[in-house]
Swiss-Prot record:
Annotated protein name in UniProt: Sigma intracellular receptor 2
Entries under PROSITE patterns matching the protein: EXPERA
Record remark on domains: The EXPERA domain doesn't possess any sterol isomerase catalytic activity.
Species this protein is from: Xenopus tropicalis (Western clawed frog)
Membrane topology category: Multi-pass membrane protein
The family this protein is said to belong to: Belongs to the TMEM97/sigma-2 receptor family.
Parts of the chain that traverse the membrane: 7-27, 67-87, 98-118, 138-158
One annotated Gene Ontology cellular component of this protein: rough endoplasmic reticulum
Cytoplasmic side of membrane: 1-6, 88-97, 159-171
Oligomeric and partner information: Homodimer.
Location of the motif ER retention motif: 167-171
InterPro entries: EXPERA, Sigma-2_receptor-like, Sigma2_recept
Other information: Sigma receptors are classified into two subtypes (Sigma-1 and Sigma-2) based on their different pharmacological profile. Sigma-2 receptors are identified by radioligand-binding studies as a binding site with high affinity for di-o-tolylguanidine (DTG) and haloperidol.
Amino acid sequence: MAVCARLLEWIFFFYFFSHIPITLLVDLQAVLPPSLYPQELLDLMKWYTVAFKDHLMANPPPWFKSFVYCEAILQLPFFPVAAYAFFKGGCKWIRIPAIVYSAHVATTVIAIIGHILFGEFPKSDVIAPLTQKDRLTLVSIYAPYLLVPVLLLLTMLFSPRYRQEEKRKRK
């Protein structure tokens, strides 16, 4: 059981550690001026949006931008803290912040995936997932950002490794 718990902690560590450059170099391109990024990163984003038909990153609507602002303001500062906690392992103090984080992220990614699967996209949009295959391919890009937070939430809620033991007062 301890090996399984430690494996999960390593998964969470790599998730949070890798999320720092992904957020800074990729995700924030949706809200920051292009002048802040080198041309190679702008070209990479253009290739990605065309190849995977990600209209949310190509032409982000206001609701999606609000999610990216939350990622920048609320989540990004949490990434190194969480990476440290899971690298170290067994840090009970990460439980409540991880529950808040995972519930928040799962909620936003469910909205994104729902939009991708069920949204109506005008045929005039050059970049949009118009076929079922396009939609499922794009969902597969976003899915890990739902699955790992849900796994984190379940771990924090049900793993005895992270439960705080209550101190009872003697009478």
